[in-house]
């Protein structure tokens, strides 16, 4: 039995799994931007084709997130996570041998599939194992996810340059994914009796609140996918090198990681997370406005503002979804559905930004589009009052379908 007010030493390895799993979910996306010119030259992918390297994984993250509760019920959380991490390792390894655009897109699909399954299942594991520390552990998971993005953006050009081979700059990511799979197989609790997540998902899809959370998560992560796809190429157009533009993307991702870890802690004593969410949205708005108006004035500051806003909002959004329901399986199902619809939405903005770039010759319209999305999310979050959680998820007509269950203490 875990103690109520502290994370016991027995959970140290489980926390290491949380950290290492999170670290592997973004490098394969963020590593492409700094190497975009080399990848495009060898594979023949144009700007819109390169956008598909972000769009395809995001689409798969959305589609397979809906299957997360069913996967967990049928195969178990542990087996699902270990298998997905093995797929991530394989997808990165295969990038050593890519020669065409279709092959590159195939690896993007494989990597997106692996990340999608992990993201769909893992929040439920956090809720189950750390029910009294959901904010802190979700913050750790989100911070490592963002930190992995920084690692991918920074390491890809550094590894590719001495090897004179962009393939190596992307394929190295197979190693930490394999390590995560081995550690997860050893340390995650063995799967027990299937839980109610699959049944809960069907009920939750009837609730408008589920769709509102999807929209908020999707529009915010559309900003993230646009930044990781086009921030480095944007500054390449301003004369920056691959290494320096990749470094800027890494700064953005480091700021994401810090905000994802710290903001849930700062917001932890408040039942109402919306003021903190609005703060993160204000930081995003300032960053995108600066990219549109004065990109060369203080690019490091703009990247840090964007990162802090995006990272904090991601982490707090996950916590808000988990706050809606006390039962880990049901809360995990709501989180998976939010991510499912959200990532389907988030897949489109990078492609739209590429299309607007082709039409206008600039990324300006893409940055302005993100400002409109932020304004929309700011208004939508006004309706996510914690006093409405119970009525929004379990109205009287559905309380028999989705009974309240008590989470195990920790």
Predicted feature residues:
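A late C-terminal transmembrane helix in Major Facilitator Superfamily
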Residues: 325-364, 370
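Helix-breaking motifs and short loop linkers at transmembrane-helix boundaries and internal kinks
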Residues: 44, 76, 97-102, 131, ...
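Extracytoplasmic gate region of multi-pass secondary transporters
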Residues: 32-33, 208-250, 255-260
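Conserved MFS/SLC helix-loop-helix module at the cytosolic interface between two early adjacent transmembrane helices
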Residues: 63-102
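Helix-to-loop junctions at the C-terminal end of transmembrane segments
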Residues: 64-76, 259-272
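Helix-loop-helix hairpin linking two adjacent transmembrane segments in secondary transporters
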Residues: 132-136, 140-189
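Intracellular juxtamembrane helix-capping segments at the cytosolic ends
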Residues: 117-130, 312-326
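Cytoplasmic helix-loop-helix junction between adjacent transmembrane helices
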Residues: 107-143
